[in-house]
Amino acid sequence: HIRPDGDTVGCAAGLCAALRTMGKTAYLLPNPGLTENTAPYFTPYSAPADFVPEKVVSTDIATVGLFPDNAKPYADKVDLAIDHHPSFESFGKANIVRPEAAACGELILDIVRELTALTPEIALPLYVAISTDTGGFIYSNVTAATHRAAAELMDTGIDYRAVNKLFFQTKSRVRMQLEAAMLAEAKFYDSNRTAVLSVPRSLLEKFHATESDAEDLSALGPQIQGVDCAVTMRELGDGVWKFSLRTGERVNATEVCRLLGGGGHARAAGATLEGVTQAEAEGKMLDAIARIVPDFKK
């Protein structure tokens, strides 16, 4: 994944660990987008430069358009694609997709049960996958099955407290400065129900922010009282803006993002626009929301 989150990394690492317990030679394709938080779960399985795979598996990736540059040669060579996004494009030779799962980690756990015994080494990254993709088990797509999966992983003796502390209760001072600046410049529309928070490159440069500092900034907007449609737009390059949309029941996030060439889940989705200014990008997102939400007003 071009911007690997905890679910992508945790699923890949957990499956890789399981395959190794079966005597398989399994590695993860190196990924330059790892953060300080996710890298420790990935690095032990990173493939050497001369490794040539016989089989290729992808986890938690909805489309080959999300492959990083070093993965693009495998775009038409994926033997098995495992995902839980409704917008999944079934690009693998074989595909396992379960949109009702809150996290792809739930699917990987089901697969692991059929392959081998669950060990702490397998369980820890899968707990990272499920906990992070559910925002600490608070999102609306979390089910009783999600909690049962987490309990099964916890029963192996993993240090789940450390995971929760790292991902949900720890912020750098730079991260807090970023959030304060985003909130100070936030724009509100639709009777204050829609918030747009922007992260231009100049803001990251101002605070000397790393990718770890900027990880999951989309979680900030939904915390604003009265907001049920939170747009986070981040500048990735000249004229390139990435949107993360987090919504309540009134707004179908994936339908909005599909209008902009993206996708995801009903309550969390994303899209990327190229060749646009910040104002143009924001306008296109607001127009897309208005097309999906009948009562939306700028």
Describe every region a protein language model picked out:
Residues 2, 8-37, 49-54, 134-297:
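Hydrophobic helix-and-loop "lid/oligomerization" segment in the mid-to-C-terminal part
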Residues 18, 72-80, 114, 144-145:
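A glycine- and small-aliphatic-rich helix-loop capping segment at beta-alpha/alpha-beta transitions
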Residues 29, 82, 96-97, 197:
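Hydrophobic residues at beta-strand termini and immediately following loops
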Residues 39-94:
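Active-site cofactor/cluster-binding pocket
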Residues 44-47, 97-100, 247-249:
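Short, hinge-like loop/turn segments at secondary-structure boundaries
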Residues 49-50, 71-74, 88-89, 118-119, ...:
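Solvent-exposed alpha-helices and their adjacent loops that cap or buttress functional pockets
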Residues 65-67, 105, 253:
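Short, well-ordered alpha-helical microsegments
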Residues 85-150:
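Short alpha-helices
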